[in-house]
Amino acid sequence: DNILYSSEVLHENQYISYGPYEFIMQHDCNLVLYESGNPTWASNTGGLALHCRATLQTDGNLVVQNSANRIIWQSNTGTGTNGDYLLVLQKNGNVVIVGPPIWATGTGR
């Protein structure tokens, strides 16, 4: 799957992927985007803590937290408004956070 939904968590060694891309919460607490096994982006939090997890919060902020729930890195994208946010690993290797729809038919079941 290439999507992380609001409140979903990537624990150690869990990832989302799309084609040659993998966005993984490593065991060393570094959140890294790989293309074909080569790192292309990182949170640079490797070695700062143990047993970390990455969470997409309900306000749209992506955070890396240690086992004591302390935030050691964040995307600083919190909107102050809770909603249905998605972190998407796109087919071009870009990782984006998108927010609630601004219009819908209201026919979803």
UniProtKB/Swiss-Prot annotation:
Top-level lineage group: Eukaryota
Gene3D superfamilies assigned to the protein according to its UniProt record, in alphabetical order: Bulb-type lectin domain
Residue ranges occupied by any Bulb-type lectin domain in the UniProt entry: 1-109
InterPro entries named among the record's database cross-references: Bulb-type_lectin_dom, Bulb-type_lectin_dom_sf
Positions of disulphide bridges: 29-52
Subcellular location: Secreted
Principal location listed in the UniProt entry: secreted
Key word Disulfide bond present: yes
Propeptide stretch(es), residue numbers: 79-82
GO CC annotation: extracellular region
Entry's Gene Ontology BP terms: response to other organism
Record keywords, A-Z: Disulfide bond, Lectin, Mannose-binding, Secreted
An example molecular function term from Gene Ontology annotations: D-mannose binding
Subunit: Homotrimer or homotetramer.
Role description: Mannose-specific lectin. Shows agglutinating activity toward rabbit erythrocytes and mitogenic activity towards mouse lymphocytes.
Name listed for the protein in its UniProt record: Mannose-specific lectin
Species lineage: Eukaryota, Viridiplantae, Streptophyta, Embryophyta, Tracheophyta
